[in-house]
Every structure is written in structure tokens, then in C-alpha cells.
């Protein structure tokens, strides 16, 4: 896709359907679990949440996985500092069995959490479906589905309210487009899972730029770009030869980022940087 874009002097978003969105809201992902007491984590998470909000991100996502009771303490603490109207998401990375996930999910309902991500094992379609039926918080997932066939099962079994395809995990843009179309054909909003380098972020920004709104009345559902705020990632800062800063855009544009019109994905890897990771047999 990148070669085709460069060959035809066309940005990726034009190749995959054209611009549907001038700007994409960005949410900050942080608040990772550490080997600390719950009280220490509460203090750390609250400070990190304040920082993410102060940088103009439109929403934020936090980790859980200490156990149901301790996790709800963490979420309540973060909700307290960001306010009741700020969009907050919770990512469990399939930390729970079904009963524990139901307990946590009912607690999240009371805290007006936007989504509960990967609450149970990705293979547990029955568990996902039961959670979706019994709690009000949106169930999000799909980053661990690596083919359109797996996604078809996830959707057919009515497991999720929000689809989170991971373009890198799916093997690339072509398979992603099939999965995205499948989700949209079943009226499931697509909010991509984003993890990795500047290449991944740039590709996702193009894909979301070309993503049509989901039906939903006067104010249809909008997607968001996930951005890791946890630490400096040299594969974001040092990999591209071009100036590429999502943080600067978020700060300057009130939480939004826009794609460039550079041909292809808009990122040219710095070959000298990549040589540091070269493996010689």
C-alpha cells in the first residue's frame, strides 16, 4: 500500500476510500499496572490521569487486573480526578473469569465507563455474549483476533459493542479493511487498537480518516485514535525521517490529530536508526 501510494503520489487515505474526517479525536492510553500496593497505584494513576487530561486528550484508558475489588478502587479513584463527564475506558487484557468480569462490569456501570476492554479470554465467546447482555457498559475487544474468520465468529456470536481491530496484528491493511467492513455491515462501531511504532500510528490515522461515520442520528458515532502516553517510545520519536508528533497536534488542536497529504503512509523510516536493530547471522 505504501509503495502504491508513493508510485501514484497518493496518500493512503485516498487509496482506501477518501477523506471522511478532517480531524480524528485522540485518546491517551496510560496507567499501567506495577508491583506496588493499591494505595500507591491509586496515587500514581490519579497523577497520570491528571497529566493526560491536561494535555487535551479527548478521553483516556487505564489498565486493571489486580482483582475485582482492588480494580474498582483504582477506577473510582481515576474517575474522581477526571470528573464524571470525561470519557474513561478500562482495559483488562482478559484478566477475569466470567463471574469476576460481571462483578467488575456492574461496578463500571455505576461509574459511567465508556467501554470495558477484553474482560475475559478472547476465545470465551459465551462469556463475552453474557457480559454484553448483563451490563450496560460497552464491551470492546478484538485485538487478539488475527483473521477475518476469527472476526466473523466474534461478530456472529454477538460478543462486542465496539470493534478494536489491530491492523499490525491482522497482518496489514488489506485484511484490516475486510474486518472493518464486516464490523460496519453489522452496525458495530470500529475504534482501532493501536500499539507500536510511528508506522502503526500513521497507518491508523489514515484508516480512521477514511472511515465513514456509523449511523446514529444527528450526532453519529465517531472513532478515536489510541495513543500510548506511558513513556518515550523511540520507535515513534526516532524512526521517521519526517516531523511526526501526535502529542503536539493534540496539544495545539484541542485533542485532535490530522493526517498529512504525503504520498503513501506519510512515514519514511530512518535507515540509520534501523541499523541499530540489525541482526547478522
What residue ranges belong to the model's regions?
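Active-site-adjacent beta->alpha loops and helix N-cap segments on the catalytic face
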Residues: 15, 66-82, 97-101, 119-132, ...
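A cross-domain feature marking catalytic cores of carbohydrate-active enzymes
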Residues: 28-30, 62-64, 90-94, 118-120, ...
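Shared catalytic-loop signature of beta/alpha-barrel
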Residues: 106, 112, 123-140, 145-256
